[in-house]
Design a protein with these regions (language model features):
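FMN-binding flavodoxin-like domain, especially the glycine-rich phosphate-binding loop
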Residues: 2-12, 16-40, 46-143
Length: 143
């Protein structure tokens, strides 16, 4: 299956999110899937309609905020037909209100019509790899 891993931080280049996306991609690819990772800040306007599964990784705007970067909303609105796509969403652990941030990200993705399967908080690269390896992209579940 073709899997798209999207990540977005506040600035254009955040090494922590890039590491999480890379490790998650490696974990998913170890199951034999074709995986591509993109930075939403740099690839604005990219069409992701032809991917079978979409993964979104982001972080909170600030330490005590529940909001995610505005570019996530803009990207999903201009990404082509994402309604009905099976997807997963993850956030990094560098927020004081992790559950609110994750809940808001789920709300944004579901408002675009995406079918959310798995959501979680990624603490480090090793955990991201383990989650990617155990993520059943075909069924959308996690072991």
């Amino acid at each position: 299956m073709r899997v798209c891993v999207l990540y977005c931080g506040n600035q254009g280049n955040e090494p922590k999110l890039k590491e999480l996306a890379t490790k998650l991609s490696d974990g998913i690819a170890s199951n034999g899937h074709t995986v591509e990772a993109f930075d939403m800040n740099l690839e604005m306007g990219k069409v992701i309609s032809f991917y079978d599964y979409v993964v979104v990784i982001t972080r909170a705007v600030s330490l005590f905020s529940k909001y995610i970067p505005e570019n996530v909303l803009k990207f999903l609105k201009t990404a082509g037909t994402v309604s009905g796509k099976r997807c997963s969403c993850f956030i990094s652990k560098d927020s004081a209100r992790k559950s609110k941030v994750l809940q808001y990200l789920m709300h944004v993705m579901e408002s675009e019509g995406m079918y959310l399967m798995v959501s979680d908080v990624l603490s480090n690269g090793d955990y991201a790899y383990a989650v990617g390896k155990r993520l059943h992209v075909d069924s959308g579940m996690k072991e």
